[in-house]
Amino acid sequence: MHSAEPSSSIPSATPAPASPPQRSSRRRRVLLVLLISFASLIVLAAIGILVWANVGVMQAESGPLAKVRTNPAVSIHETPDSFILSPADGASGTGLVFIPGAKVSADAYLYKLSGVVVKSGLTVVVTKPILNLAFFDQRPLTTFTNAAPDVDTWFVGGHSLGGVRACQYAAEPDVSGLILLGSYCANDLAEVDTRALSLSGSADLLSTPDKIMDAAHLLPTATTFFPIEGANHARFGDYGVQAGDGVASLDSSIVRDVITAEVDSFIRTG
């Protein structure tokens, strides 16, 4: 008998390691996929912000807007950046750059601010914030003051989030004072040599009187606080009901009269 010869197993072939060019190509593909994914997320986020900022913008009520547009004592000029309110006669050489609240149309403030235009000869430039949100609008103050070259004394002001942005302008040397309507500062102006007027509403549930007083330490020493009994957040403009706000018991025309009287007194006492 012949003895069986031991079977010899043939080892399986081991794949050759990837060459450096192959590994480099794979890394590039992975990096490209990651970059495309990241860019897509940025584009989607930008689209989302654009849609959100332009949906639900609170428009000016037609009645008050018609009143100011048909008032022969007030001149209205619109530019891509702003609305300019000026007295038909007797401009004082003093101006106010006013910044709207978040997602509120700029022309919703024309009627409320037109009273002081007539009473004191004030020129008012109501800005059109980028994306309807003041914190996105980082344009210099001269973007708006240049719209009224005959004005030589400037105040800044705003409503709600617009007031927060106005506070940032208030520290500039060419600004004579700050006017806040239902608003407060986020930056510290306590050591800035300027003046401020803060009007609030007792029925304001957004910029509540408590929130305004909690931030009062950020305002200049020379600040006048004037609470308007019965006014809510939306009463500082004319754009209807605002979600989350309180119910106003004071008529809109009376709020306009108070704004006119207090702003006129403030700018005259400087």
Task: Give residue spans per PLM region.
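C-terminal catalytic-base region of ester-bond hydrolases, centering on the histidine
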Residues: 214-270
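Short alpha-helix in the alpha/beta-hydrolase fold that links the catalytic acid
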Residues: 112, 207-218
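Hydrophobic membrane-insertion alpha-helices, especially the h-region
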Residues: 33-52
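Gly/Ala-rich beta-loop-alpha elbow adjacent to hydrolase catalytic centers
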Residues: 157-166
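Short beta-strand/loop motif that positions the catalytic acidic residue
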Residues: 192, 198-200, 204
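Conserved alpha/beta-hydrolase
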Residues: 113-134
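Short beta-strand element of the alpha/beta-hydrolase
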Residues: 92-102
